[in-house]
């Protein structure tokens, strides 16, 4: 297999690739994450993943580059990473007692080809008290995460139900990625 590069500094994505025993190196993409005029959350995450992969692939032509992006949506509103604790609190209050969607887009890119895909997962939160939200925000955990929570961390206690790929909510749909990567590297046509 060609050298595999993760175009992300996300510790969660690194952990998931290690969990799947995928050898890789990290080259952080310096792409500014801006959401343009896309028609759907799926289009947004796939476009951002592709931008990240493309930026790194330009200087690593003999490698397979992985770009990924995750967003949370509720009621047609996109919830990215909060800019501060106040915005994190607003997001968590918005999600309290409700079901929201998490989209993770993935792009695999080499000199020969590019494959993009996404996973959509529904997450339902318990009703959260203001105190629970404040205590969680004080941990600083939500400040670098889309939707202001980490399902794999202390934010797990907010989750009542999940429908879809848990690891996609963490940041990378690892089971599907491994299958896509095998097909990508084998030269098989992608359906």
From Swiss-Prot:
The EC class name is hydrolase
This entry carries the following GO cellular component terms, namely:
cytoplasm
Kindly report the protein's main subcellular placement as a broad class: cytoplasm
Q: Name the residues annotated as catalytic in the UniProt entry.
A: 69
A GO term for molecular function:
dTTP diphosphatase activity
CDD domains with a match to the protein in the record: Maf
Cited Pfam families: Maf
Query: Where does the record say this protein resides?
Result: Cytoplasm
Q: Which UniProt keywords apply?
A: Cytoplasm, Hydrolase, Nucleotide metabolism
A biological process (GO) of this protein is:
nucleotide metabolic process
**Origin: domain of life:** Bacteria
Matching entries from SUPFAM superfamilies are given as: ITPase-like
* Cofactors required: a divalent metal cation
The EC code for this enzyme is 3.6.1.9
- Return the annotated site residues (Important for substrate specificity): 12, 70, 152
Entry's PANTHER family? BIFUNCTIONAL DTTP/UTP PYROPHOSPHATASE/METHYLTRANSFERASE PROTEIN-RELATED, BIFUNCTIONAL DTTP_UTP PYROPHOSPHATASE_METHYLTRANSFERASE PROTEIN-RELATED
Task: Describe the family membership recorded for this protein in Swiss-Prot or TrEMBL.
Answer: Belongs to the Maf family. YhdE subfamily.
Query: NCBIfam families of this UniProt entry?
Result: maf
Explain the purpose of this protein: Nucleoside triphosphate pyrophosphatase that hydrolyzes dTTP and UTP. May have a dual role in cell division arrest and in preventing the incorporation of modified nucleotides into cellular nucleic acids.
Q: What protein name is recorded for this chain?
A: dTTP/UTP pyrophosphatase
Organism, scientific name: Bacillus cytotoxicus (strain DSM 22905 / CIP 110041 / 391-98 / NVH 391-98)
Query: Which taxonomic lineage does the organism of this UniProt entry have?
Result: Bacteria, Bacillati, Bacillota, Bacilli, Bacillales
């Amino acid at each position: 297999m060609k050298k595999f590069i993760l175009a992300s500094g996300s510790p969660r994505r690194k952990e998931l690739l290690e969990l799947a025993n995928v050898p890789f190196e990290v080259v952080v993409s310096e792409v500014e994450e801006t959401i343009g005029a896309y028609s759907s959350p799926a289009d947004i995450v796939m476009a951002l993943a592709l931008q990240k992969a493309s930026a790194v692939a330009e200087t690593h032509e003999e490698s397979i580059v992985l770009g990924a992006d995750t967003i949370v949506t509720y009621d047609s509103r996109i919830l990215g990473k909060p800019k501060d604790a106040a915005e994190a609190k607003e997001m968590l209050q918005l999600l309290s007692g409700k079901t929201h969607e998490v989209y993770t887009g993935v792009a695999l890119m080499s000199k020969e080809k590019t494959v993009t895909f996404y996973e959509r997962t529904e997450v339902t939160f318990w009703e959260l008290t203001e105190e629970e939200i404040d205590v969680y925000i004080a941990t600083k955990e939500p400040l670098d995460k889309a939707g202001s929570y980490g399902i794999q961390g202390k934010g797990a206690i907010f989750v009542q139900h999940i429908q879809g790929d848990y690891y996609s909510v963490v940041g990378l749909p690892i089971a599907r990625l491994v299958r896509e990567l095998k097909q990508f590297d084998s030269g098989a046509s992608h359906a």
